[in-house]
Amino acid sequence: PDSFESEGYDRSHMRLPECQNRLIAEILEVQPNTVIVLHNGSPVEMPWINNVKGILEAYLGGQAGGAAVANILYGIVNPSGKLAETIPVKLADNPSYLNFGGGDKVEYREGVIVGYRYYDTKQMEVAYPFGYGLSYTTFTYSNLQISNTNPTEKDTIIVSVDVTNTGSITGKEIVQLY
């Protein structure tokens, strides 16, 4: 239903339909080795988060989304994505929660303390932080080099690092620098 996910529609909550949460709970009763695949356009509350073996956030994968999910679940492709947003535990943890304008009105009253900065500043627990992502393999970082450790506003800084796959599975890594 539109109240849960629809193009051009803002939700007033982060819940999944309760029938989906009940289905997940019932599946977990008979099969605790369960991985949940989410197909959603924005974060959702996950009351079952501590009871599942894994969660694959597929977002809205489009035409090839199903094949991509299958390739990850069957180990044909190594997952290498990182979250581009922080996933809060619940809607009330979101900094814009009290400022939801409704309809076609958007209000950003958080100032510069938005997204992951808000959660870091408030030292809040989140379901998953900005930049989080798992892999079937492991990587080591070495030889970090920064061209200028005391830059001015006009300076260009070049950062380089060597990334080595130390696991037994072929994979790609996204290097993150903040």
Regions flagged by a language model, labelled:
Residues 1-178:
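C-terminal non-catalytic regions of proteins with extracellular/luminal or membrane-system context
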